[in-house]
Amino acid sequence: MATVNQLVRKPRVRKVAKSNVPALEACPQKRGVCTRVYTTTPKKPNSALRKVCRVRLTNGFEVTSYIGGEGHNLQEHSVILIRGGRVKDLPGVRYHTVRGALDCSGVKDRKQARSKYGVKKPKA
């Protein structure tokens, strides 16, 4: 325990919280242009071809974003919206693509959890 005199001379230093999503710069989402759309394999013990894209954001950052859902229409030069949220089994992927916004279509034939995949309510 520090004495009062020691604390007067050198006060306690606050810990600075580090952001998990630095490229968003405290915004909820950011717009960007796809520079590369590709698949990659997850860490052990999982096995799949995960759809991801490299995105150049409006603030100059270049990040990797995960494309959730079954099937997508993204290609190079597509304009997309990204949000925060990492993919645990893909190292370096800290962002998700927002489905149903800008050039990214919603998931086709999706009936449940539609809001997460940009799908409108089906007609009765």
Curated annotation (Swiss-Prot):
Xref: SUPFAM superfamilies: Nucleic acid-binding proteins
CDD domains linked: Ribosomal_S12 (cd03368)
GO biological process, one term: translation
Sorted UniProt keywords: Methylation, Ribonucleoprotein, Ribosomal protein, RNA-binding, rRNA-binding, tRNA-binding
Record PTM 3-methylthioaspartic acid, positions in chain: 89
PROSITE patterns tied to this protein: RIBOSOMAL_S12
A GO MF term: rRNA binding
Family annotation (Gene3D superfamilies): Nucleic acid-binding proteins
GO annotation, cellular component aspect: small ribosomal subunit
Subunit structure: Part of the 30S ribosomal subunit. Contacts proteins S8 and S17. May interact with IF1 in the 30S initiation complex.
Biological role: With S4 and S5 plays an important role in translational accuracy.
Entries under PANTHER family matching the protein: 30S RIBOSOMAL PROTEIN S12 FAMILY MEMBER (PTHR11652)
Family indicated by similarity: Belongs to the universal ribosomal protein uS12 family.
Protein name: Small ribosomal subunit protein uS12
Organism of derivation: Erwinia tasmaniensis (strain DSM 17950 / CFBP 7177 / CIP 109463 / NCPPB 4357 / Et1/99)
